[in-house]
Amino acid sequence: MRARSLSPETIRTRLQHVRTTARGLECAPSKVTPEMLLEYVSTKPWQSETRHSYYASLKQFFAWYSRIYRYENPALVLPTVKRGSPMPRPIPDNLLAEALAGCTPRHRLALELAALAGLRSGEVARVNAGDITVDLLGYSLVVHGKGNKQRVVPITDDLAAAIRDLAEPGTGWVFPGADGGHVTPRWISKLGASLLPSPWTMHTLRHRFGTHAYAGDRDLVAVQRLLGHASVSTTQRYVEPPSDAMRRAANSAQIID
C-alpha cells in the first residue's frame, strides 16, 4: 500500500478492515471461501459508505493474497455497492456558536478549521504554522489532504493568528502528538464528537463550510476546490442550496403563460 502512495490514514483503515474481518471469520485467509465471506459481510448492518470501504479493503487484500499464494480469490463474489447520495447536513450556526463558547482556545481552533476553512479531521490534525502563506489578498493555509494531495485555502487574519499562537515551538504542530509528530485523525474526530451536541460531528462542520461558501458566490467549482473534492458531484452532497434560491426556483414553476 505504501508503494501505491496511500496515506497513513488510508493504510490504517484498510488494515483495520482486514483485521476485523479476520477476527470475525476466525480462520486463516487460505481457508476463506466465497460463501463464507459473503455470509459474513451480509450479517453486518453497515451503511453504504462503510460497506463500500470494507469491500474495497477486502478486495485489495484478497487480490494480493491470491496473487502471491496462487489462491482462489474469495472477494470476487463481493457485489458492487450502490452508494447513496445523502442530504447535506450543515450544523446550525447557533449550535456551533454554543459549542465554540465553551471551548479552550486549541479545541476552538479545531472546530473553526473545519467550520471556517472546510478541513477534514485528518487535515486538521496535520495543520502546521509553517503552512501559512500570505499574499496581497491575505492569509492562506496549505492543506495536506487525502492521497497526499495539497490545496490552498484562504483563511482569515484571526484564524492565521490562532494557528501561529497555538503552534508548538520547534515543530510548528498545532495539535502535537506524544512522539514529536501530530495527533491522529481519530483523535480530532473524537474531540469534535465530545465538543459538539449529538448528532453533529466534525464532518457536519465541513458541510457548514461548503454550504456557506456556496451561498456567498454560488460557484460550485470554487467550493469543490476549497473542500478538496475530486469531482463536483461529491461537492453537491456537502452543499445545501440557499433557501432563497430554492424558493425562487419553485416560484418560477408557478407561472403559467
Where are these regions (language model features)?
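Short, charged phosphate-coordinating catalytic segments
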Residues: A114-L137, V221
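C-terminal catalytic core of tyrosine-transesterase DNA break-rejoin enzymes
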Residues: E112, L116, R208-A230, R237
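Catalytic-site neighborhood detector that most strongly recognizes the C-terminal catalytic loop/helix
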Residues: G147, L227, S233-S252
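N-terminal core-binding DNA-recognition domain of tyrosine recombinases/integrases
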Residues: M1-M87
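Basic, Lys/Arg- and aromatic-enriched nucleic-acid-binding interface segment
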Residues: D93-S121, A125
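DNA breakage-rejoining catalytic core of tyrosine-based enzymes
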Residues: Y71-E72, K82-E98, G147-D157, P169-G172, ...
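Active-site/catalytic core of tyrosine-dependent DNA strand-transfer enzymes
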Residues: T156-P199, H203
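Conserved tyrosine-mediated DNA breakage-rejoining catalytic core shared by Y-recombinases
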Residues: R126-D165, S233
